[in-house]
Amino acid sequence: MIALIQRVKRADVQVGERTTGEIGAGLLALVCAERGDTEAAADKLLAKLLGYRVFSDAAGKMNLPVSNIDGAGRAGGLLLVSQFTLAADTNSGLRPSFTPAAPPEEGKRLFDYFVAAARERHPIVETGEFGADMQVSLVNDGPVTFWLQVRP
């Protein structure tokens, strides 16, 4: 599984005119299931995402996770957006191949599992809508962006 995470001041996702998710300071995570991924991979990626230290401590060092963005225990928001294009194979030609991505039904199942697990472990979780044409807006903080990937 893959997550492209961005530290944000705020972010939201819309489907048409409807806002499906919105957060203040926290992490926007574009999430993709690859062929062969399992719930164990989703759990491993979520643990990495929730524990990844990308927020600054009092000394200005990236040393705090999304569960404690200010060093005083305040949790940041987590906006999870499905994006199968992260699994694209771009090694040949001028058109990406999406064969490495999980099939839509499996991708949705794993994304829904990931979201449910995140909601059990983190107080502020918002989402996009799987398979929808979404408009994602964000104010990137830094910018700070990381590619997280785990194998099943």
Curated annotation (Swiss-Prot):
Gene3D superfamilies: D-tyrosyl-tRNA(Tyr) deacylase (3.50.80.10). GO terms for biological process: D-amino acid catabolic process. GO terms for cellular component: cytoplasm. Its EC number is 3.1.1.96. InterPro entries: Daa-tRNA_deacyls_DTD, DTD-like_sf. The keyword Signal does not apply. Keywords: Cytoplasm, Hydrolase, RNA-binding, tRNA-binding. It is an enzyme of class 3 (hydrolase). GO terms for molecular function: D-tyrosyl-tRNA(Tyr) deacylase activity; Gly-tRNA(Ala) deacylase activity; Ser(Gly)-tRNA(Ala) hydrolase activity; tRNA binding. A motif (Gly-cisPro motif, important for rejection of L-amino acids) lies at residues 142-143. It is found in: Cytoplasm. Pfam families: Tyr_Deacylase. It catalyses: glycyl-tRNA(Ala) + H2O = tRNA(Ala) + glycine + H(+); a D-aminoacyl-tRNA + H2O = a tRNA + a D-alpha-amino acid + H(+). Its main location: cytoplasm. Transmembrane segments: none annotated. It comes from the Bacteria. Belongs to the DTD family. PANTHER family: D-AMINOACYL-TRNA DEACYLASE 1, D-TYROSYL-TRNA TYR DEACYLASE. Homodimer. An aminoacyl-tRNA editing enzyme that deacylates mischarged D-aminoacyl-tRNAs. Also deacylates mischarged glycyl-tRNA(Ala), protecting cells against glycine mischarging by AlaRS. Acts via tRNA-based rather than protein-based catalysis; rejects L-amino acids rather than detecting D-amino acids in the active site. By recycling D-aminoacyl-tRNA to D-amino acids and free tRNA molecules, this enzyme counteracts the toxicity associated with the formation of D-aminoacyl-tRNA entities in vivo and helps enforce protein L-homochirality. A Gly-cisPro motif from one monomer fits into the active site of the other monomer to allow specific chiral rejection of L-amino acids. This is D-aminoacyl-tRNA deacylase. It comes from Burkholderia vietnamiensis (strain G4 / LMG 22486) (Burkholderia cepacia (strain R1808)).
